[in-house]
């Protein structure tokens, strides 16, 4: 994470590079999906609004946005408004709790999240969990609690919790 003010030309250069990448990926039949990450992970785009500004400036139809509830908990207060603000650029959502655990029982306002997703063209919801018991996987990512010791159980619980929201 950059611990100083970014250079003035960073946003224009980022947008220009993303436009070129979007075109290259389009020719290859691949979508580019970008995820804003919390200020503790990146300085480039921390909020949905910041990522949307970069994508709009890059001005390529092949650039899309993926939001992550783990990063939203740090950067926004109104999840539904943040999700809706991305509009047609929203491709998907990484769903996990504020501690990266199974959805449900934490701080994420799931009814508001799924209500807002229904107002978008979101094509994908994936469950993101990390098993810190696998070598140094979690430690290298700053995840010190093993909130996902059993990936199969994580997915079963996540599906059971979220299924009522998507019907």
What are the roles of these predicted feature ranges?
Residues 45-67, 72-167:
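Histidine-acidic metal/acid-base catalytic patches
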């Amino acid at each position: 994470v950059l611990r100083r003010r970014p250079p003035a030309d960073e946003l224009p250069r980022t947008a220009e590079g993303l436009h070129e990448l979007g075109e290259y990926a389009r020719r290859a039949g691949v979508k580019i999906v970008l995820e804003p990450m919390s200020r503790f992970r990146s300085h480039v785009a921390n909020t949905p609004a910041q990522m949307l500004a970069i994508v709009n400036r890059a001005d390529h139809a092949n650039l899309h946005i993926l939001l992550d509830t783990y990063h939203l908990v740090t950067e926004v207060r109104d999840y539904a408004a943040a999700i809706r603000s991305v509009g047609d650029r929203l491709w998907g959502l990484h769903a996990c709790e504020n501690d990266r655990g199974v959805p449900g029982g934490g701080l994420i306002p799931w009814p508001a999240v799924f209500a807002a997703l229904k107002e978008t063209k979101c094509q994908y919801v994936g469950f993101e969990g990390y098993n810190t018991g696998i070598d140094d996987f979690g430690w290298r990512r700053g995840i010190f609690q093993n909130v996902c010791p059993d990936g199969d159980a994580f997915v079963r619980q996540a599906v059971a919790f979220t299924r009522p929201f998507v019907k």
